[in-house]
A protein has these predicted regions:
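Short S/T/G/P-rich N-terminal loop/turn motif that feeds into the first structured element of a domain
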Residues: 1-232
Length: 232
């Protein structure tokens, strides 16, 4: 590893930004989609290009159940917005995404404070295997912060018994030229997919969230992508 590869990219800072790329894949099978991914974004050159511009981590999930059949989710954390913009303005990167997805959405999110986030340890021998998402427009970020904090207070103990690892809430970063529109995404990481879905079926705590929603929430559940997808 060269010294140049250890230098922070232009515009990098301590703050991290969440990139969620969700889309329908063109391939008929997950295995075929994995091959396309690993030869484009997941190729050694693709990985190095992303990391050199501030892509700190990249994980791949597939839809769990009929609701997200045929969909793939990337969860990436970046620490350089200029680097992220430069990466996704590269025609080769866009061409690779077009090979993989028939349709996709790739919003960027910034960290929030005061939303009841928590991050717990993972017991030995366990790992994150599942993700639960809730994405929704809210009446205001201040009101949403109070509501999500109340949600966490009411649910953290029960959710941990079902295997939750972390719960974080992020606010939408507007696209260049767009007006800010309060929207958040909640990201739950879990150790067991079955226990995760069982917990969500209980419907705990949502009475605290409903009053601040300014639209219908989009909820989805995901599992770690099977097979050897390139991740870092």
């Amino acid at each position: 590893m060269s010294e140049a590869s250890l230098a922070p990219p232009p515009g990098a800072g301590a703050a991290t930004f969440l990139l969620t790329v969700r889309g329908k894949v063109k391939a008929a099978t997950t295995q075929e989609a994995r091959t396309v991914h690993n030869s484009t974004a997941g190729s050694p050159a693709g990985v190095e290009a992303a990391r050199s511009l501030g892509d700190l981590s990249h994980q791949v999930f597939t839809g769990y159940g009929d609701g997200q059949a045929g969909e793939v989710l990337f969860i990436d954390f970046w620490n350089s917005l200029p680097g992220l913009g430069q990466f996704f303005s590269d025609p080769q990167v866009l061409a690779g995404a077009d090979l993989l997805f028939s349709s996709r959405d790739a919003p960027v999110w910034s960290a929030t404070s005061g939303f009841g986030d928590f991050h717990l340890t993972i017991p030995a021998g366990k790992a994150v295997t599942s993700v639960g998402l809730i994405r929704v427009k809210v009446s205001s970020l201040d009101k949403a912060a109070d509501a999500f904090t109340a949600y966490t207070a009411a649910t953290i103990n029960a959710s941990r018994r079902h295997g939750i690892v972390s719960h974080s809430v992020w606010s939408r970063v507007p696209n260049p030229g767009d007006q800010p529109d309060p929207e958040v995404i909640g990201v739950d990481l879990w150790m067991d997919t079955g226990k995760m879905t069982g917990y969500y079926d209980l419907g705990l705590g949502f009475d605290a969230l409903g009053p601040v929603f300014a639209g219908t929430p989009d909820t989805s559940v995901w599992q770690s992508a099977p097979g050897d997808w390139t991740e870092w």
